[in-house]
Amino acid sequence: RIPSSAASDVYKRQYQGYPVKAAENSTKKRRSLGIGFIGLAHYLAKNGEHYDDSSAWQLTHDLTEAFQYYLLKSSNQLAKEKGKCEYFDRTKYSQGILPIDTYKSDVDEIVPNNLKYDWESLRTSITTHGLRHSTLSAQMPSESSSIVSNATNGIEPPRDYLSVKKSKKGPLKQIVPSYSYLKNNYTILWEMKNNDGYIKVISVMQKFFDQAISGNWSYNPEHFEDNEVPVSVMANDLLTTYKYGWKTSYYQNTNDLKSDEIDVKESLDKLLGECSVEQEDDCESLSLIHI
């Protein structure tokens, strides 16, 4: 309940003005939130899963079901305490329609639709008492916040164990969390032979999210003949994402085969030498809290 309650309080405070009255009116009456994941790659690695493992799809399905269920439950409870958002009656939620009612049924080919929570009781409570927010879940890139929290970017596989990110104060080196004992569990983006596993992970997430997730497609030319990505591969990815219910896509990443001009092994050894394995996740050189 903490994220939805904290985010809801933002509407109490006037942090900035609105360019037009219509924007202010809609914002305050809809009270839309967009809460999402950060560090999914780390979560899968901790559970010994790779993006192309069918067990990873089930794990992500269960995680996202719980995530959306408790977001709705929290917003419903806030509505009981403080009242529903003014535009609640303009949402599908007011009609008793939940994300589990509208997802592409093809997703059931990835993970069977065996739900673990009491959605029907929640549905009844929502139609009776409403929601404090018109929307709740959305997936952000979290490029900057992942640095502060020492997490992998949003729902994306890391491009390497050590990456260099630009900031106003110069380049920052960031190592994946728990590298010493999870390095063999991570899915590395440019080592992926295809996008199939990633596409399915995002698809089972979209089943529960109430706003569109913008996923990415990534290609490493080294995995293809003559270092050229066939158009047929890209077209197949496009059709597959549509089949499984993606709403939007964002980037089409291609490995340009250029390094970040750092010796990855040497840099990793230097960073890891500054703290023990037990201290790794809290080590200052790895947490990269940059003020």
Predicted regions and their residues:
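Internal maturation/activation junctions in enzymes
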Residues: 8-24, 28, 50-142, 214
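Contiguous, well-ordered alpha-helical segments that form the cores/surfaces of helical PPI scaffolds
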Residues: 31-46, 62, 144-147
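Cysteine-cluster motifs in flexible loop/terminal segments that predominantly coordinate metals
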Residues: 277-288
